[in-house]
């Protein structure tokens, strides 16, 4: 039915007869001539109907937007005055000689000439995907997938599938559970990742594994998260963390070079502690030059408990962010930023405008200046290297609150004030994460997952001082997004059992949930390490969008629903009975 795609035509095809298939993007009637823009997945081409054949012209006259058609025609060069430089096929047009209307279209529920709401786009996703902007994104994602497969195949990796119906294991988020009809009352879990199976493959002797695989997490959604997502999953035996990073960095660098003609350069390596200290985040956006500066030592003795309290608390932090040119911010803007950091638990935000950095305390304007001595202000200006016209923003609270609030504020102000260079790329590796972190109740949790190996520690040393353990883990960060993360895995049963005990998983629970893994670790397990990339997030960055739904053909909303199919839906009573499931409505008690 088709001899070539519309978007592939150019001047080399002049005088050739072609067969095209696609949709009518636009129609224009100019007297005796009928012009249409025909669209397929590769682009647009202009078709002209100018014929004495009454049947052809009559049929062309009925064409409307999104009619699906097949046509034949002759490629001809446009006159110089009619060349459309904004169109890749703008040097040529097709003189239509035959037309077959395959299917007509009703008036569209989407207007392709204006911005439609995301809800409407998702409800009519099959129409939304016809837009060239969307089809280009899906094609670029497909190219990224193909590139990954080629690269890993050429480097000796085997594409091996792992189960989708599996056992629930604690990996940080809630599982999606699937009831078993055969084993009534029992449930499978959809995998949050193939983590344990890929480790078992290493124990099976498949020393280089990969898989582009669907994963599932029942968690609150954001613009860059989905309940089902696609992971580029990689695992290797007999490779160090340095070697894994080197190989996967090479893959991403070559991907960007191939698909975008961008050289990312060598990725700098930053310890987790440095990332948190300077940027308040373990995924810093290095396109933004602003850094946090600690000032606890300067304010620990001031008569202002908002500063001195956290400064003298071992779990507290007092840090400042110097914003170049920020003195021009209005009081309303500062109030808005104060509300913004409140989302992250911050109770307020002090500020200091620098009118003349050479004048010390006399050159600043701040509601907290009265609590600070002239010497403290002078030292503050020197430490931050603040210049005239800058503003210094203060964060003082528990360390985690300051990091989250000031880290997020740094990102927001960087974009709002155009400090962040959005036209650049800034990759890095973040390494040396703590193995465990403590919650507000003092309970330890794994920073990554319970199968991550510590650096230079025995099992007994790990149990004796888990808070000091540094994991052999690594995250790849690009423009403030974590695009991949991995680690060296525990390959010794004693170490794995010690890690479980630290996390409060007793021996019985270890056997119930991980008995198969602990058994496998007893039979000559090789050292192994791996990494997983989020394909959706990589595609989002490649396509230059900040919404992950833009690069998924049929995504879910932030409420984890599909507006196209109305999933999830309630099953019928017979289906539930067959699974021995009853739905209990939760009673809502009103206070009287």
From Swiss-Prot:
Q: Name one GO biological process term.
A: aspartyl-tRNA aminoacylation
One matching Pfam family, short form? tRNA_anti-codon
Q: Which GO terms describe its molecular function?
A: aspartate-tRNA ligase activity; ATP binding; nucleic acid binding
Give its E.C. classification number.
6.1.1.12
This enzyme catalyses: tRNA(Asp) + L-aspartate + ATP = L-aspartyl-tRNA(Asp) + AMP + diphosphate
Reply yes or no: does the keyword Protein biosynthesis apply.
yes
Q: Which residues bind L-aspartate?
A: 171, 217, 448, 489
Q: Which PANTHER family match?
A: ASPARTATE--TRNA LIGASE, MITOCHONDRIAL, ASPARTYL/LYSYL-TRNA SYNTHETASE
Q: What is this protein called?
A: Aspartate--tRNA ligase
Q: Report the source organism.
A: Pseudoalteromonas translucida (strain TAC 125)
